[in-house]
Amino acid sequence: MTIIRVKENEPFEVAMRRFKRTIEKNGLLTELRAREFYEKPTAERKRKKAAAVKRHYKRIRSQMLPKKLY
């Protein structure tokens, strides 16, 4: 549970911004969206496998030497 203490004479907008920032750092919004609907275990494995493959190809692409431009 995220708790934000509002300081004296602190505008509401600033406190709200701090609250949103802490929630984003904790990853609560992403977890909430993931748990909003039930996902079958097979679908979850498939999604995670696809994400791993995507990360792998992205890592390989970043390590490749750039082609010569001439």
From Swiss-Prot:
Keyword match Protein biosynthesis: no
Pfam families (UniProt xref): Ribosomal_S21
Keyword check for Zinc: no
One GO CC annotation: ribosome
Any one Gene Ontology BP term: translation
Keywords, in A-Z order: Ribonucleoprotein, Ribosomal protein
GO molecular function, one term: structural constituent of ribosome
Domain of life (superkingdom): Bacteria
InterPro entries per UniProt: Ribosomal_bS21, Ribosomal_bS21_sf
HAMAP family, alphabetized: Ribosomal_bS21
PANTHER family registered for this protein in UniProt: MITOCHONDRIAL 28S RIBOSOMAL PROTEIN S21, SMALL RIBOSOMAL SUBUNIT PROTEIN BS21
Family named by the database record: Belongs to the bacterial ribosomal protein bS21 family.
Protein name according to UniProt: Small ribosomal subunit protein bS21B
